Amino acid sequence: MNDLARRHFVRAGLAAGALSVVPPFARAQQATLKVVWMGWPDNQVLPLMAEFEKRNPSIKLAVERMPFTQLFQALEVRLNGRTSDPDIFIVDSPLTASYAARGHLMELDPLIDKSRFSAGALAAGQFNGKIYSAPFGSSMQVLYYNKAMFKAAGIEPPAPDLAKRWTWEQLVDAGRKMAKPAENIWGFTFEQQERPYQLLPLGQSLGGKALSDDGLKATGFIDGPAFVEAFTFMQKMYTEWKISPPGQFDTALTPELFGSGKCAMLLGGTFINDTLKSKFQNLDFGIAPHPYFAKGKPVTPTGAWHFGVNPRSPQKAATAQFVRDMLSDDMNVAWFKLRPYVPTVKAVWQREAAMFNSDLWRIAQAELDSTALPRPATPGFREYEDILRVALRDMQAGGSVAQALTGAAQKMDRELAKYK
């Protein structure tokens, strides 16, 4: 165990011990919790917080919502001040290890019944085998396809059945028959063209491992044969087969490309479904599972917004009640209805079966239970992601895949060394 982790376990052990004996919040007590949350619209946040206060009249929530572009930097400044503000804060799940290793998250194992949650969601909130961020929502990628474009090309579309999941090779073959690059018509696009969340599953499908088990070494992992092969295949989508639009790094533009009939297939999040239906009402599209390599295995990305407890908060009973209540079945149903992230609580799928009676949600639930793999747990995820994003852009532009990955791995190792 490295010194950073050892120091952290001493702090976390004391905090966890305190939490394990925290009683339910007494109504006679009064508390105000400072909460930093994502800057989602009023109608997706305020009803949830109001419901918590209604259920817990002795606890008031002072909620500060921050836009995505400011959230991470603002949290860094505040948490590095090592004060009790905020008591509760939103956590992008791959940053769990980073926050936990630096002593910014309370261990939550005493408050969470692991049997209630999907395995992938729990894994996304863990560091060194302990839960540090509460799994409040997950994500899943599905393959959207334009039925009219498939029909015009005489191609049988993929089925909404995991047992009949398309391979990447099948996808490219179909995409080449529908792409017309000179006319800005494309066969396929990733929603997030240069983000590890979207693209790591390609190498993982071939058995690749994105990082060492301790999250501190990239060389020999992200630059290994599986990722070189997978990202060479990805590169050819742009440079040789020309089925994918180059340079589309704005995640708001790729759904537009698909919705406007300029792209036959889009690999994107479940949340895009509602956008496509509302914004492109004449678009006739179908949904199928995430592809995999013929000689590999299916792997899908997962992870989304969690929340955590500041271990320096003096409001132990109130923060514990926030965790318990927000992770209840009722509150998770309410949260899904406000903002439909993939549910992490198993009971939600059963309680709201009618809502999930569609290809989209049947696929998402099945993937979450069988193929979902969170991003690698490392205290240096921000550095890891930034370096890999640059390398992915270079590869898509035609640069040497092996050289790009070797260089990226070396840079990652230098950055991750500071956490040893």
Task: Please report, for each region that a protein language model flagged, where it lies by residue.
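N-terminal secretory signal peptides and thylakoid transit peptides that target proteins
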Residues: 1-17
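Long, aromatic- and glycine/proline-rich binding clefts that accommodate carbohydrate-like moieties
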Residues: 29, 281, 288, 336-390, ...
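Extracytoplasmic "Venus flytrap"/periplasmic binding protein-like
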Residues: 51-119, 131-133, 148-154, 158, ...
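Extracytoplasmic/periplasmic solute-binding protein
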Residues: 132-136, 141, 167-219, 226, ...
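A bilobed periplasmic-binding-protein/Venus flytrap-type ligand-binding module shared by bacterial periplasmic
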Residues: 144-147, 302-314
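Glycine-centered hinge/linker elements that transmit conformational signals in sensory
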Residues: 173-177, 216-248, 290
